[in-house]
A protein has these predicted regions:
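Sparse, context-dependent recognition of short Cys/His-centered cofactor- or disulfide-binding micro-motifs
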Residues: 98-101, 123, 133, 144
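A conserved alpha-helical element in kinase catalytic cores
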Residues: 79-89, 128-167
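Generic, low-specificity signal for short hydrophobic/alpha-helical stretches with a mild N-terminal bias
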Residues: 95-98, 126-127, 141
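Juxta-kinase regulatory segment immediately upstream of eukaryotic protein kinase catalytic domains
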Residues: 2-102
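Polar low-complexity intrinsically disordered regions enriched in Ser/Thr and small residues
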Residues: 19, 51-54, 107, 122, ...
Length: 168
């Protein structure tokens, strides 16, 4: 899977929201908005000491150039496509949403995960792929979650949409 080619299908570059793109030593990449970054950083789950320090401090210090240089954060502007924005707004009953992106663990089953939020509240998550095998895994996961919910298990995530987008 080419993560950049998938991102190009649902991100509009050069316009929209101000985000920072950064990667860790394992070549995992994130796109985090400058607005409500503390909420967005919930998508960033570091295990190492340096990553945990960055998660705690970057939302407060991202405006300092020296900090961005230390972590090799690139300033980018982008927004999601209108089709995807409409879908999220409809699913979450909101007129505006915010997003952050994890580009996945580099592996054969790499997928993109988006965190959808509004203000200080996380609304949900979205997984994205262009790989048919991974899409089948998504469908199986959605079916399992639905079955667990039917069996009465509490706190089971609800899959609100599992399908293809026409924009790619």
């Amino acid at each position: 899977m080419q993560v950049n080619s998938i991102l190009e299908r649902f991100l509009i570059k050069g316009a929209g929201k101000h985000l920072y793109r950064f990667s860790n030593a394992d070549n995992k990449t994130w796109l985090m908005p400058t607005h409500n970054m503390q909420v967005a950083m919930n998508l960033y789950q570091p295990s190492g000491r340096n990553g945990k320090i960055m998660k705690a401090l970057f939302p407060w210090l991202h405006h300092l150039l020296i900090i961005r240089k230390i972590i090799h954060a690139e300033s980018v502007y982008c927004d999601i496509t209108d089709e995807l924005k409409r879908l999220f707004c409809q699913l979450f009953h909101e007129t505006e949403i915010e997003f952050s992106i994890f580009c996945g663990t580099p592996c054969i089953h790499q997928k993109i995960t988006m965190q959808i939020s509004k203000g200080k509240h996380i609304l949900g998550y979205c997984k994205v792929t262009d790989n048919k095998e991974i899409a089948l895994l998504f469908r199986n996961e959605a079916n399992i979650l639905k079955e667990l919910g039917r069996k009465g298990l509490k706190e089971v995530p609800i899959c609100m949409f599992c399908g293809e987008m026409t924009d790619g």
